[in-house]
Amino acid sequence: MQKELSKKNKIKNKNHCRIFTMENLLCLLIIICPILDVSSFIFRNFFNTNFSISTFVRPIIPIVAITYIFFKDKIKPQIIIAGIAYLGYAICHVYIFYKIKTGCAYGNELREIQYLVNYTFMVMNLFIYIYFFAVKNREKEITQQTVGKSLEKVKKAVLIALTIYIALMYLALITKTSSFTYGETQVGYKGWFESGNSIGTIMLLSLFIVLPMLNKENKLAIRIWVLMITVLVGAYLCTLLGTRTGLFGFIIVVMAYIAFTVLYNLLNKNKLNKKILTIGVIILVLVGIAVTIFGSKTIERRRELKNKENEIYDTMTNQTAHVTGDTVELVKKIKAGQMDENYMSESMQQAYLDLYNTANEKQISNTNMRTLQLIYHSNLIKEQNSIPMLLFGNGYMSHYYEMIFEMEVPAFLFNFGVIGFFLYFIPFLIIAVYGIYVILKKFRVVKVEFAMALSGLWFAIIISFLSGYTFFNSSTMMIIIALSVIVINQIKDIDDNEVKIYNPEKGNDTL
């Protein structure tokens, strides 16, 4: 009797150990992202602060994970070298920020450090997830013929997180407590989240992971779940969010999934999967009906911007301005010699003059902020003519609030310098570029899941260049990291020919 009890206790202890694994904790970090986002929004608005509880909660699991890796694996020197590199860069960057900051700066040293910490954790999380989901358990899973088991946890974690996101969004809409995507004009709805652009990007990138779960290998309950969530997400993104990314992005994701599925069947001379085509068409039709009945906040936003464009007047030319009203006033002061260099440096003043002249010459819309910001920062780099700033950046928060870069890829290069660009952005770009190389070389054995994940990664890079709110958002980065891990795993499957090794009958969704 006692032996049986001791056996049962051992089994229970093993089960508990299996539950509290690093892989499960990392999946939990993905699942709680929507809860952390909502808590951040409520905390910041209630206490009117830039900090929140989630600022301190998010790093806990990654710190535990990196500590585990440091003491359990034989890569201590590499971790120490990487830590020194990122710390050294941060010190140089903050020092430059401190030296060049003027009165017009939108943030102080603490805010700048906050961005550096977020980006460092972003790269650290990428390493952690690759280590646990693409390296550590791989040999064991191959031996046990369970390759991809831990990765399935990541995909299901993304599905659960997406479900929570859309559930919270509709709850905010039903209770009429949703905030507006564009608060100044009360257009679009973003629920209890900080940014409409970021919540839209999170949902779109999640769909790149979730939609391939419609294949026959998953249980019927999972497929129904995915279908319902996709329709709800599509209805929200296309009718209620109010951003072009949401409206056109959803159509791109669904069409990409249909295209990859059809392409596979054509390449492998299989019958077209009519169910997939039917599901895709149904999703697009349902969303189209929703847009027709309820209208689209995106279209409303475009009309509002067009009206706003005609309202901004340039008193120096007596015509509609091609820059913002604030920029017109700043340029007037600069031309009149009334701008204090303690408020705005000489190089910034010249960059504003160049921006004003270029915008008028090219007839740029005064509401096209991203183009105006790109012109300003390009001119500022030329005017500063500084090697240290070129290498370590001229600061993200050191500019007048209108010129804080929304386009993240150029921001990495201009505001964080060439070294910052390599430290924070290049790791993701390498994965994306190598994924393209593998697909072009071995496209006949590429799974639809791989094609979708790689498309999602490139979609994130393109969106971060065009609209922003991608790499600068902690929760969005978790989905990008999940996409990266899927891509790496799929590449390893192809390179090692493991599809046949661990399951020769599997692979009915390859391109």
Over which residues does each language-model region extend?
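Transmembrane alpha-helices of multi-pass inner-membrane enzymes
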Residues: 27, 254, 453-464, 470-511
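Interfacial loop-to-transmembrane-helix boundary motif in multi-pass membrane proteins
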Residues: 26, 82-86, 129-170, 219, ...
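N-terminal signal-anchor transmembrane segment
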Residues: 2-71, 89-102
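Long extracytoplasmic/lumenal interhelical loops at the membrane interface
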Residues: 190, 343-419, 439
